[in-house]
Amino acid sequence: MKSLNIIFAGTPDFAAQHLQAILNSQHNVIAVYTQPDKPAGRGKKLQASPVKQLAEQNNIPVYQPKSLRKEEAQSELKALNADVMVVVAYGLILPKAVLDAPRLGCLNVHGSILPRWRGAAPIQRSIWAGDVQTGVTIMQMDESLDTGDMLHKVYCDILPTETSTSLYNKLAELATSALIDVLDNLENSKFIAEKQDGSQSNYAEKLSKEEAQLDWSLPAMQLERNIRAFNPWPIAYFSTEDKDGNAQTLKVYQAEVLPHQDKPAGTILSADKNGIQIATVDGVLNLLQLQPAGKKPMSAQDLLNGRAEWFTIGKVLA
């Protein structure tokens, strides 16, 4: 088994976990590419990405170009003479000159079973859509978005209580071992490249804060999936009014679907220790864990202890 000289390109914690797995393997990371430092926190101080922090701890050269389209950046990368480039949630488009620079091309770790969800948010969209199974795909990159030949797929179930946080952690563990397996066998015939069927693909669009607002004209089953898909970001929310008529926005962390009641969508049906029940166009959404502004997430019962007037039975929420 040959040790490979690898360029690693990635930015968030999900990527850093893959970098650590390669560092723990027999392969050599000769350079790391990551997004430029970005302002973060209240002081808006420049903050290095998790991948950069890990690279610096291991004395690996770090490159942070704003783009890889310029010839200078491409020449710099090519001069590294890498065997392969591993790309995990990097955040920059790789032009053909970069894809062709490493001897064995560029590999990408994708957080779903392709071609089902191509794009930026495959983990979240798989929950949002009600998929019961997902996984990770290691693919050979080409010039289009998530369309390259698939080398290795590893499957896992999506549990009925799965959030994007829990699924992300599960997939990270699967993906790191799958990646090392591919790298260890890249120059033998263990993994045969498989073409994608583009007709089976969907675009996993980025989540937005606007989309996280609970829309009572949607079925309760869809809203419950949204709550899990949008955790840890942007967190599903809705608004009600206090006794003075002031709008109060609440984030929702946990809910369950109950049988349909014949009331207009958005009607508060009950509010007690068992939850806050809201009628939807199809089914009832029972809110179990919520977070008012400036407070920590709490049970519906704890929320009602001081704010019962926010949830008058029969009130119709917008």
UniProtKB/Swiss-Prot annotation:
CDD domains, per database record: FMT_core_Met-tRNA-FMT_N, Met_tRNA_FMT_C
Reaction catalyzed: L-methionyl-tRNA(fMet) + (6R)-10-formyltetrahydrofolate = N-formyl-L-methionyl-tRNA(fMet) + (6S)-5,6,7,8-tetrahydrofolate + H(+)
One annotated GO molecular function: methionyl-tRNA formyltransferase activity
Any Gene Ontology CC annotation: cytosol
PROSITE patterns: GART (PS00373)
Name of the protein in question: Methionyl-tRNA formyltransferase
Matching Pfam families: Formyl_trans_C, Formyl_trans_N
Stored Gene3D superfamilies: Formyl transferase, C-terminal domain (3.10.25.10), Formyl transferase, N-terminal domain (3.40.50.170)
SUPFAM superfamilies: FMT C-terminal domain-like (SSF50486), Formyltransferase (SSF53328)
Chain residues that bind (6S)-5,6,7,8-tetrahydrofolate: S112, I113, L114, P115
Known EC number: 2.1.2.9
UniProt organism field: Haemophilus influenzae (strain PittGG)
Family membership noted in the UniProt record: Belongs to the Fmt family.
Entry superkingdom: Bacteria
UniProt keyword list: Protein biosynthesis, Transferase
Function: Attaches a formyl group to the free amino group of methionyl-tRNA(fMet). The formyl group appears to play a dual role in the initiator identity of N-formylmethionyl-tRNA by promoting its recognition by IF2 and preventing the misappropriation of this tRNA by the elongation apparatus.
Gene: fmt
